[in-house]
Regions:
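Dynamic "connector" segments at or just before major functional cores
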Residues: 2-183, 189-206, 213-227, 416-448
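Short acidic (Asp/Glu) and glycine-rich catalytic loops that position anionic groups and cofactors
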Residues: 15-20, 50-54, 92, 318-323, ...
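An anionic, glycine-rich sequence signature occurring as long contiguous blocks
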Residues: 22, 255-358, 445-448
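Short, conserved catalytic/metal-binding motifs centered on acidic residues
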Residues: 73-74, 88, 106-110, 158-168, ...
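Short amphipathic alpha-helical "interface-anchor" segments enriched in bulky aromatics
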Residues: 88, 280, 336-370, 375, ...
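Flexible loop/turn segments at secondary-structure boundaries
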Residues: 97-98, 112, 169-171, 198, ...
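Domain-level cores of phosphate- or acyl-group-handling catalytic modules
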Residues: 209-265
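Basic, amphipathic alpha-helical segments enriched in Lys/Arg and hydrophobic/aromatic residues
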Residues: 363-394, 398-426
Length: 448
């Protein structure tokens, strides 16, 4: 904010009430209730904007909007409490356009930009002759990782733990297909490092999760490695338990941990096992064991087994009095307890999908076709990663927030503050009407 300054206006007034009603005075000044958004817009323009335009190129050379401005306008929708792209024109434009230099584009421009960034679907044909569409969006996936590296959220040369899963998004778009969950939609594969989304590939909702998953993972791993980001450990559910997928994962990480799918031949070995060790994990008593098994011909891996006694007392045809869960891994040094506890951390990643659905628009996709909606998924992933970047640097206690707070709380606690732009001494000043002096410098950033 080198061209602007901030003034905190601390006001304490009492209203005189006559006949049960407060006196009301109408002022025509341009005061916005979203005063905190201008901080966010400027940080986005400083940290994210140059990377977006550098990777995607200039959209125009004269008076049109660049892709960084389109992305920032889309960001402002969710940072001001909106839930669909049209909110920027219907409700937010009078407030966002108050910024003296940063332009905000209309919802029509955002949607045109999304269409321009879309790429053609890739069609794969199964052995049975059925065709399934995938959308890889290579350029935007590259942008997603480059932004994380530029903000320091990922550090080149470091190794991280990666989670991969498919998220089923319910929608009734033109090309949405019926999923096994009995609703129409898409089933994008999403890769996550920590609390950050690092890769998304969209696919037809009726495609089996294992179908060409190894190709998706190969592209995600290669994209990370192109920026010198490496995977130390990978966690995945039973949808990734196939020979082709495991061989791909092995090439790109030190260790993998995959939920093994159940089969009758495996239970014969489990029931004959001895030497179970009792462990209490998260308040639940389990019995743990591990064996070396030849999951596929010529491929032996470690199988970590946990079993829990059935509470209802009934016996299953295959499992007997226990419920069995298995983890396939190439980690031969960690104890069974360490492996189970590490794999269980994967459950926390579901919060990310819930956050995207409810806070960043995944529940209300804006376009009619998968290729364009894939662009939207990736742009909102960029926006959420930027939100996590801000929250790590925000003085959260000063605003009654936590580092893990959802964006709805951020809107209420930080964005929603009265403010007014004024021009004085040949430069612009943002007056913020609050008694919270932390607005003077809320973010711990290198540029202040």
């Amino acid at each position: 904010m080198s061209d602007f300054s901030l003034t905190l206006v601390l006001q304490f007034k009492t209203s005189k009430i006559i006949n049960g009603m407060a006196n009301i005075s109408i002022k025509s000044q341009k005061i916005t209730p979203f005063g905190g958004i201008f901080h966010v817009m400027e940080k986005f323009d400083h940290y994210i904007g140059p990377v977006v335009d550098g990777e995607l190129g200039l959209r125009c050379t004269t008076f049109g909007y660049q892709y960084s401005e389109i992305t920032r306008s889309l960001m402002s929708v969710y940072f001001c409490g909106g839930d669909c792209v049209e909110d920027v024109t219907s409700h937010l434009m009078p407030h966002l356009s108050l910024h003296p230099t940063l332009r905000t584009c209309s919802s029509d421009t955002i949607l045109r930009g999304i269409k321009e960034l879309s790429t053609t679907n890739t069609t794969y044909t199964s052995e049975t002759g059925r065709s399934y569409d995938f959308n890889t969006a290579v350029r935007l996936n590259r942008l997603l990782v480059k932004i994380l590296v530029s903000t320091g959220q990922l550090v080149a040369g470091n190794s991280y733990d990666l989670d991969f899963d498919h998220q089923f998004i319910e929608t009734e778009k033109y090309d949405a297909k019926m999923t096994y969950k009995k609703f129409t939609g898409y089933s994008p594969g999403v890769a996550v490092i920590g609390d950050l989304i690092v890769g998304i590939e969209n696919r037809d909702g009726n495609a089996n999760v294992r179908f060409h998953q190894q190709d998706t993972l190969e592209r995600i791993f290669s994209n990370l490695e192109s920026d010198d980001i490496h995977v130390r450990r990978a966690r995945m559910d039973c949808g990734s338990c196939s020979r082709e997928i495991v061989e791909t994962i092995e090439k790109h990480c030190e260790h993998f941990y995959i939920r093994a799918n159940r089969c009758s031949s495996l239970y014969d070995n489990l029931l004959a096992l001895r030497g179970w060790k009792r462990e209490v994990i998260n308040g639940i008593e389990y019995e743990l064991n591990s064996i070396i098994t030849e999951k596929w011909e010529g491929k032996a891996y470690r199988l970590v087994i946990q079993r829990e006694r059935r509470m209802d007392g009934e016996q299953d045809l295959w499992e007997g009095e226990y419920t069995y869960r298995c983890i396939l891994t190439d980690d031969y040094t960690s104890t069974p307890r360490e492996i189970v506890e590490f794999y269980n951390l994967r459950g926390g990643k579901e919060r990310i999908f819930d956050d995207m659905n409810n806070g960043f628009g995944w529940a209300r996709l804006p376009k009619s076709f998968m290729a364009e909606n894939t662009v939207f998924l990736l742009l909102t992933a960029v926006i959420r990663n930027f939100y996590k970047f801000l929250m790590e640097r925000l003085d959260t206690k000063a605003f009654g927030l936590k580092k893990s707070s959802r964006i709805k709380a951020f809107v209420f606690k930080f964005i929603s503050v009265p403010a007014k732009w004024i021009r004085t001494a040949r430069h612009y000043v943002l007056n913020i009407y609050t008694d919270n002096s932390s607005y003077q410098n809320p973010f711990t950033l290198a540029d202040g």
